[in-house]
Protein backbone atom coordinates (compact mmCIF):
# COMPACT_ATOMS: atom_id res chain seq x y z
CA UNK A 1 0.00 0.00 0.00
CA UNK A 2 1.52 3.34 -1.01
CA UNK A 3 2.26 5.84 1.72
CA UNK A 4 0.90 9.35 2.17
CA UNK A 5 3.95 10.88 0.48
CA UNK A 6 2.46 9.78 -2.84
CA UNK A 7 -0.36 12.28 -2.25
CA UNK A 8 2.04 15.19 -2.89
CA UNK A 9 2.38 14.53 -6.63
CA UNK A 10 -0.50 15.31 -8.99
CA UNK A 11 -1.22 14.28 -12.56
CA UNK A 12 -3.69 15.58 -15.11
CA UNK A 13 -4.63 13.65 -18.24
CA UNK A 14 -6.76 14.69 -21.20
CA UNK A 15 -8.52 11.55 -22.38
CA UNK A 16 -10.69 10.56 -25.34
CA UNK A 17 -12.36 7.17 -24.93
CA UNK A 18 -15.65 5.48 -25.61
CA UNK A 19 -18.34 6.42 -23.11
CA UNK A 20 -18.34 2.94 -21.55
CA UNK A 21 -14.66 3.25 -20.59
CA UNK A 22 -15.31 6.75 -19.25
CA UNK A 23 -18.08 5.43 -17.00
CA UNK A 24 -15.72 2.88 -15.46
CA UNK A 25 -12.78 5.25 -15.05
CA UNK A 26 -14.72 8.17 -13.56
CA UNK A 27 -16.08 6.00 -10.73
CA UNK A 28 -12.92 6.40 -8.67
CA UNK A 29 -13.55 8.70 -5.71
CA UNK A 30 -10.15 10.28 -5.22
CA UNK A 31 -9.95 12.07 -8.53
CA UNK A 32 -11.41 15.08 -10.25
CA UNK A 33 -13.07 14.52 -13.60
CA UNK A 34 -14.35 17.19 -15.94
CA UNK A 35 -16.08 16.08 -19.12
CA UNK A 36 -17.66 17.47 -22.21
CA UNK A 37 -21.26 16.69 -22.98
CA UNK A 38 -21.66 13.30 -24.69
CA UNK A 39 -22.24 13.85 -28.41
CA UNK A 40 -21.54 11.88 -31.58
CA UNK A 41 -18.97 14.54 -32.62
CA UNK A 42 -15.85 12.53 -31.63
CA UNK A 43 -16.88 9.40 -33.51
CA UNK A 44 -17.27 5.93 -32.10
CA UNK A 45 -15.32 2.76 -31.46
CA UNK A 46 -16.54 -0.33 -33.26
CA UNK A 47 -15.55 -3.45 -31.30
CA UNK A 48 -13.50 -6.01 -33.23
CA UNK A 49 -16.07 -8.67 -32.34
CA UNK A 50 -18.61 -6.78 -34.45
CA UNK A 51 -16.30 -7.01 -37.46
CA UNK A 52 -15.58 -10.69 -36.77
CA UNK A 53 -19.31 -11.39 -36.67
CA UNK A 54 -19.76 -9.68 -40.04
CA UNK A 55 -22.05 -7.07 -38.51
CA UNK A 56 -20.05 -3.89 -39.20
CA UNK A 57 -22.68 -2.46 -41.56
CA UNK A 58 -25.51 -3.09 -39.10
CA UNK A 59 -23.49 -1.54 -36.26
CA UNK A 60 -22.49 1.50 -38.33
CA UNK A 61 -26.11 2.00 -39.38
CA UNK A 62 -27.25 1.93 -35.75
CA UNK A 63 -24.57 4.50 -34.84
CA UNK A 64 -25.65 6.74 -37.73
CA UNK A 65 -29.31 6.52 -36.68
CA UNK A 66 -28.46 7.43 -33.09
CA UNK A 67 -26.36 10.38 -34.32
CA UNK A 68 -29.31 11.55 -36.43
CA UNK A 69 -31.61 11.29 -33.41
CA UNK A 70 -29.11 13.30 -31.34
CA UNK A 71 -29.03 15.99 -34.06
CA UNK A 72 -32.83 16.12 -34.11
CA UNK A 73 -32.96 16.59 -30.32
CA UNK A 74 -29.97 18.79 -29.50
CA UNK A 75 -31.44 22.23 -30.28
CA UNK A 76 -34.72 21.84 -28.44
CA UNK A 77 -33.53 19.39 -25.76
CA UNK A 78 -29.78 19.97 -25.26
CA UNK A 79 -29.66 18.31 -21.82
CA UNK A 80 -31.57 15.22 -22.92
CA UNK A 81 -30.07 14.71 -26.40
CA UNK A 82 -27.08 12.77 -25.05
CA UNK A 83 -29.44 9.94 -24.05
CA UNK A 84 -29.64 9.13 -27.77
CA UNK A 85 -25.87 8.55 -27.94
CA UNK A 86 -24.70 4.92 -27.43
CA UNK A 87 -21.74 4.05 -25.20
CA UNK A 88 -19.58 3.25 -28.23
CA UNK A 89 -19.29 6.97 -28.99
CA UNK A 90 -16.22 8.77 -27.67
CA UNK A 91 -16.25 11.42 -24.99
CA UNK A 92 -13.47 13.83 -24.11
CA UNK A 93 -12.61 14.43 -20.47
CA UNK A 94 -9.80 15.34 -18.13
CA UNK A 95 -8.78 13.39 -15.06
CA UNK A 96 -6.72 14.80 -12.23
CA UNK A 97 -5.44 12.68 -9.36
CA UNK A 98 -2.45 12.21 -7.11
CA UNK A 99 0.18 9.49 -7.37
CA UNK A 100 -1.39 7.45 -4.58
CA UNK A 101 -4.68 7.28 -6.45
CA UNK A 102 -2.78 6.60 -9.69
CA UNK A 103 -1.24 3.51 -8.14
CA UNK A 104 -4.61 2.25 -6.92
CA UNK A 105 -6.55 3.08 -10.09
CA UNK A 106 -3.99 1.96 -12.68
CA UNK A 107 -3.31 -1.35 -10.93
CA UNK A 108 -7.05 -2.02 -10.71
CA UNK A 109 -7.93 -0.86 -14.23
CA UNK A 110 -5.07 -2.77 -15.87
CA UNK A 111 -6.24 -6.13 -14.52
CA UNK A 112 -7.01 -8.95 -16.99
CA UNK A 113 -10.69 -8.92 -15.99
CA UNK A 114 -11.05 -5.31 -17.15
CA UNK A 115 -12.37 -4.15 -20.49
CA UNK A 116 -9.63 -3.63 -23.10
CA UNK A 117 -10.68 -0.02 -23.76
CA UNK A 118 -9.98 1.23 -20.24
CA UNK A 119 -7.04 -1.14 -19.81
CA UNK A 120 -5.35 0.63 -22.74
CA UNK A 121 -5.96 3.99 -21.03
CA UNK A 122 -4.48 2.73 -17.74
CA UNK A 123 -1.38 1.38 -19.48
CA UNK A 124 -0.89 4.61 -21.43
CA UNK A 125 -1.20 6.66 -18.22
CA UNK A 126 1.40 4.43 -16.60
CA UNK A 127 3.74 4.96 -19.56
CA UNK A 128 3.25 8.73 -19.45
CA UNK A 129 3.91 8.88 -15.70
CA UNK A 130 7.18 7.01 -16.22
CA UNK A 131 8.37 8.58 -19.46
CA UNK A 132 6.80 12.00 -19.99
CA UNK A 133 6.58 13.07 -16.35
CA UNK A 134 9.84 11.28 -15.62
CA UNK A 135 8.42 9.78 -12.42
CA UNK A 136 9.93 6.33 -12.84
CA UNK A 137 9.82 5.72 -9.06
CA UNK A 138 6.05 6.27 -9.02
CA UNK A 139 5.59 4.02 -12.05
CA UNK A 140 7.80 1.34 -10.49
CA UNK A 141 5.69 1.46 -7.31
CA UNK A 142 2.80 0.02 -9.35
CA UNK A 143 3.85 -3.54 -8.65
CA UNK A 144 0.45 -5.08 -9.46
CA UNK A 145 0.07 -3.43 -12.86
CA UNK A 146 -0.73 -5.92 -15.62
CA UNK A 147 1.14 -4.88 -18.77
CA UNK A 148 0.16 -7.72 -21.13
CA UNK A 149 -1.88 -6.87 -24.23
CA UNK A 150 -5.42 -6.00 -23.05
CA UNK A 151 -7.21 -8.02 -25.73
CA UNK A 152 -5.28 -11.23 -25.06
CA UNK A 153 -5.65 -11.03 -21.28
CA UNK A 154 -9.40 -10.46 -21.53
CA UNK A 155 -9.72 -13.44 -23.88
CA UNK A 156 -7.80 -15.64 -21.46
CA UNK A 157 -9.95 -14.47 -18.52
CA UNK A 158 -13.10 -15.30 -20.51
CA UNK A 159 -11.74 -18.77 -21.31
CA UNK A 160 -11.02 -19.45 -17.64
CA UNK A 161 -14.54 -18.33 -16.69
CA UNK A 162 -16.02 -20.57 -19.37
CA UNK A 163 -14.03 -23.56 -18.08
CA UNK A 164 -15.29 -22.91 -14.53
CA UNK A 165 -18.90 -22.79 -15.76
CA UNK A 166 -18.43 -26.00 -17.77
CA UNK A 167 -16.87 -28.01 -14.94
Predicted regions and their residues:
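A conserved ligand/cofactor-binding region detector
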Residues: 1-167
Amino acid sequence: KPGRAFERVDYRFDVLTDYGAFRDLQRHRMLTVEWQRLTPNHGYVRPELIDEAGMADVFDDAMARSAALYDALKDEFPEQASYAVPMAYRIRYSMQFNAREAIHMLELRSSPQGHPSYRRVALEMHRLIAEQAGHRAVADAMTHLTVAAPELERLEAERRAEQRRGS
